[in-house]
């Protein structure tokens, strides 16, 4: 009976997470979440979104998630949710596409639980296995996203204030990187996420400048205030029941030792040390609050595991049915708190004028982050030659009558480099470095 329940839970997690990604409600990849508004607001087509999702997620699945899962015999959540991001975005944004994504996600979840090693072995058959290198594509997105408030300030209030915001953002990041570990006791520490804290600092400064914007203080402006952040959270709140179910399923799966949220708690859970695994997961979740909350508020897209407290619940509650209920309640509380934060942000004068600049700044940042990530991945696959191909791809795309959107060039270029590397290897024209 327990074995059947395990397969039911993993299938449900895979199916629902794929559907959430397909409908652009929630994605797990922190690097993909800021990209989704580009698709939702029609600045990116479905093909470019699918290619970006694959490029920034699949390498992490193969190079990080699967090997770690095999070592512990417990699935690292990245294996499931990074792949469901890809499944969801690759299926059409239609009713049939939604159903297809759910079916494929369920099958993938069951297959993942059934045999992890087979998947890795298949990709190891490639002459040049470049999938691990594709993880470089998303290496800078989370970091780069932290600078978008500074770009917004520069666009709206001038370069000088933008520089001030950028400098403070950088200082906060470095301070957290240096002093961001808070010891709970001799064995446990809370490690604050430096990029999340930097993003939070930048947003606070952006809101301070917006509050000081006199043009936004008149009565008519306030009456016509566009609820930018509240509208984003309202979109998340609309889907709160299905997000709650998603959180509950993840908590139940963690409770049954099917999955874990990070390698440290995964290892402790494999050893049967649920309490320390829970404390470790709690410390990680606290550190990631700013990153998940701020990206949710600014994009209108949530994470399937929320702020990751559902893993703590699953680890500390051994009964999967109770964990299911508690996990669902946890996600509801998180979303309600997001709404409170968003309504508070909307009261700041000047936010209305920030709207277009926020969107423009996010596009700027993601464009350059994905291009640099593509270059890093290409260089990892084929040093120097990879850079040549990416630059050529970028320039030729610019000259095309129907160019690809800029943010798709880096990820697609990295995939192209990987394919070219394998073809050249078969033609005896390329030998990868040892």
Cite the ranges covered by each PLM segment.
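Glycine-rich, N-terminal phosphate-binding loop and its surrounding beta-alpha-beta segment
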Residues: 55-90
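Signature of multi-pass transmembrane helix bundles
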Residues: 1-53, 79-299, 312-434
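Conserved structured catalytic cores and adjacent interaction surfaces
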Residues: 304-308
């Amino acid at each position: 009976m327990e074995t059947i329940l395990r397969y039911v839970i993993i299938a449900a997690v895979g199916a629902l997470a794929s559907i959430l990604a397909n409908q652009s409600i929630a994605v797990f990849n922190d690097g993909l979440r800021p990209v989704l508004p580009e698709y939702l607001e029609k600045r990116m087509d479905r093909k470019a979104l699918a290619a970006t999702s694959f490029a920034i997620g699949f390498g992490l699945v193969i190079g990080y998630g699967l090997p770690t899962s095999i070592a512990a015999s417990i699935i690292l959540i990245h294996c499931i949710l990074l792949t469901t991001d890809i499944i969801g975005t690759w299926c059409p944004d239609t009713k049939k596409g939604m159903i297809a994504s759910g079916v494929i996600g369920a099958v993938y979840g069951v297959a993942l639980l059934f045999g992890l090693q087979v998947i890795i072995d298949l990709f190891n058959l490639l002459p040049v296995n470049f999938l691990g290198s594709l993880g470089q594509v998303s290496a800078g997105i989370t970091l780069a996203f932290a600078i978008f408030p500074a770009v917004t300030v520069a666009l709206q209030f001038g370069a000088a204030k933008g520089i001030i915001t950028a400098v403070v953002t950088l200082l906060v990041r470095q301070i957290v990187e240096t002093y961001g570990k808070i010891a709970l006791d001799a064995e446990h520490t809370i490690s604050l996420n430096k990029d999340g804290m930097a993003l939070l600092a930048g947003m606070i400064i952006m809101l301070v400048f917006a509050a000081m914007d006199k043009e936004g203080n008149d009565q008519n402006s306030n009456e016509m205030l566009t609820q930018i952040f509240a509208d984003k959270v309202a979109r998340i709140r609309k889907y709160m029941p299905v997000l709650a179910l998603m959180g509950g399923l993840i908590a139940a799966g963690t409770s049954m030792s099917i999955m874990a949220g990070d390698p440290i708690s995964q290892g402790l859970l494999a050893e049967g040390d649920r309490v320390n695994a829970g404390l470790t997961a709690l410390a990680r979740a606290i550190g990631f609050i700013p990153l998940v909350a701020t990206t949710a508020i600014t994009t209108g897209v949530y994470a399937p595991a929320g702020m990751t407290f559902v893993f703590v619940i699953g680890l500390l509650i051994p009964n999967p049915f109770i964990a299911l209920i508690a996990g669902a309640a946890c996600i509801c509380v998180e979303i309600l708190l997001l709404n409170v934060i968003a309504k508070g942000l909307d009261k700041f004068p000047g936010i209305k004028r920030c709207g277009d600049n926020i969107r423009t700044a996010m596009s700027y940042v993601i464009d350059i982050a994905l291009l640099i990530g593509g270059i890093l991945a290409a260089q990892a696959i084929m040093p120097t030659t990879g850079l040549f191909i990416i630059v050529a791809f970028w320039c030729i795309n610019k000259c095309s009558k129907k160019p690809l959107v800029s943010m798709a060039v880096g990820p697609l270029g990295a995939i192209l480099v990987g394919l070219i590397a394998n073809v050249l290897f078969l033609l005896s024209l390329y030998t990868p470095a040892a």
